[in-house]
Amino acid sequence: MNKIILSIAVVISMCIATSSFANPEKNEIVPKQEHEEMLYPTVLVRVGNGSGSGTVVYSELNEENEYQSFVLTNWHVISSNVIIKNEWSPEKKENIDTETRRPVNVDLWEYNNYSTSVGTIGRVAKIVAYDKGRDLALLQIEDTEGQMPYVATLYPEEVDEGPWIFQTVYAVGAGMGKPPFPTTGLLAGYSRDQDGRALYLASAPIIFGNSGGSLYVYSPRDTYELIGVPSMVSAYGWGNVITHMAWSRPISEIRVFLRDNKYGFILGDEPEIAEEEEDKEEDK
């Protein structure tokens, strides 16, 4: 009799466990917030035979009742789609530089049970801004009828003095062209590049294809917020990369990049504030 009761209990517990696994919403272990705030806004950026990562940072209706959706990535990810030629201009009667920006393919992943990638939805995007020195670029999705379902939250300005060294960070990207995956580490240091622009050093490993993705912290606002765009890793010798010494373009440089290119509204700037920032830049 005891054996029968034990067998029934085992079967019931297995059914409960199976049911819980099949329906993640009933499973408190599933990190729903992490999926929605870090994993799902990550996209694959494809150019020619290469690829990198990107992050959806804005998707809202504009005054024409059309959705404007933007993806943040690295300049070096999309640089092959910007062609600059020095050509003769009959009008100016001299050689001038002409620029052509080819469209970029952006793939958004779809998931089952939160974590299982089951395919992608392709979008075409245009390169609307880039900064070679900061290694940043902004893409605009050409589809204006649909809103991007998940958008990353940018670390806000003047709310605290963070992020700080020793904070846990999460690097998310579509490394090697695979579905996005996270790695964890610490914010390990602050530095500057040879032109004096700020950099973050993090111990969260990144690999080829992670460039253009995102670096997050869990903020005092109980939200995972983007603090940087992974751009490069340290190396020594001939091609010996150190993946856990990863350098990102920090949120301070992202803000300057967006405002310099008149996309301050992505940061929440009002139009008049954006104009004031432009005037300040012109006065310098």
What is each of the regions a protein language model found here?
Residues 29, 33-34, 52-55, 60-62, ...:
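Active-site substrate-binding loop(s) of clan PA
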Residues 59-129:
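Catalytic-histidine neighborhood of serine endopeptidases
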Residues 25-35, 82-113, 226-284:
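C-terminal cap/linker of serine protease catalytic domains
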Residues 41-44, 68-74, 162-176, 202, ...:
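Active-site-proximal beta-strands of protease catalytic cores
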Residues 30, 42-74, 245:
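A conserved glycine-rich beta-strand in the N-terminal activation segment of trypsin-fold
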Residues 1-4:
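Positively charged n-region of N-terminal signal peptides that target proteins for export
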Residues 33, 128-134, 145-146, 178, ...:
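Gly/Ser-enriched beta-turn/beta-hairpin loop segments
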Residues 8-16:
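Bacterial N-terminal signal peptides
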